[in-house]
Amino acid sequence: MVAGTGNPRVEVLPLDLADQDSIRSAAAQFHHRHHALHVLVNNAGAHIAAGRLTGDGIEMNLAVNHLGWFLLTNLLLDTLRSSAPARIVNVASQAIADARAITWLGRPRPARIDLDDLQSERAFHPMAAYAQAKLAIVMGTYHLARHLEGTGITVNALHPGLVATGIVRGFGIPRPLLPLFTRASRPFLATPEDGASTAIQLATSPDLAAVTGQYFVRGKPARSPEASYNRDLQEALWTASEHLTRLAPGRRQETW
C-alpha cells in the first residue's frame, strides 16, 4: 500500500473480527497510538457456509459481519466524538433485499431479524444467516445515526455492488467448480476499486458531510427493507448486540 500510494503514513493493526479479545486489543492499540479519528470504514465481511462458532461461542456470520463492527465502533466512539466532524461508514450487502441463495427465480425474499434466533441455532441456512447479519448492520447504522445527531458524527451504510472478491469461496460452491464460477461471473462483477467507490464517497465527499442515517447503493440513497426502519426492533437488536459483545448498557450514556 505504501508503494502503491506513495504515502509512508500507513499503519497496520492486527484485528480478527471473529475474536472479541482481538477487537478490544486493536482498539486499545489505536488509543495508545492516536488521539484523533475522523473516518471509520467498517468494510470487512465474510459469508460462512458452514454453521461454525467463534471462540466466543457466536455464529460466525453474525460475529464477523455485525458484532465485529458493532464492538469496534463502540470502543472508538469516544475518540470519534472528540475528533468531530467524523464519519462512520458501514458496508452491508444487497442480500438484505433478497436472502435467497438463488436470486433469479421467483420473488425476492427480504432479510429479516429473528431476535429469538440471532445465531441461527434452530435452522442454519448460510445465505439467511449472512443476510440477517448484513441487515443488522443497516439497522445498527440507523439506530446509531439517530442517537449521534448533533455530535458532528455521521453514520451511513452502503451496498458496494457485486464485487470480484474472494467472498464467493464461502457461498458453498464445490471447490472443483470455483474456477468455472469465477470465470463465468467475472463480466458481471465490479472491480474492487469500483466497489470501493461508494464507501470512499461517503467517507470523503463534502456534499455528504451532513448526510446521516442513510443507506446507499451505487452512490445514491436507497430504501432498505421496511423492517429495518422499525425503531423498536433496532433498539432490541442493539441491546442484544451489547449482550453478545459484553458491552455494559450504561456505556451508551457515556458515549452518546
Predicted regions, residues:
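Rossmann-fold NAD(P)H-dependent dehydrogenase/reductase core
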Residues: 1-171, 247-256
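C-terminal helical subdomain
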Residues: 23, 133, 157, 182-222, ...
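A generic structural signal for short coil/turn motifs at secondary-structure boundaries
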Residues: 50, 224-227
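Terminal hydrophobic/aromatic helix or amphipathic segment near a protein terminus
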Residues: 162, 172-194, 251, 256
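C-terminal amphipathic/interface module of NAD(P)-dependent oxidoreductases
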Residues: 226-256
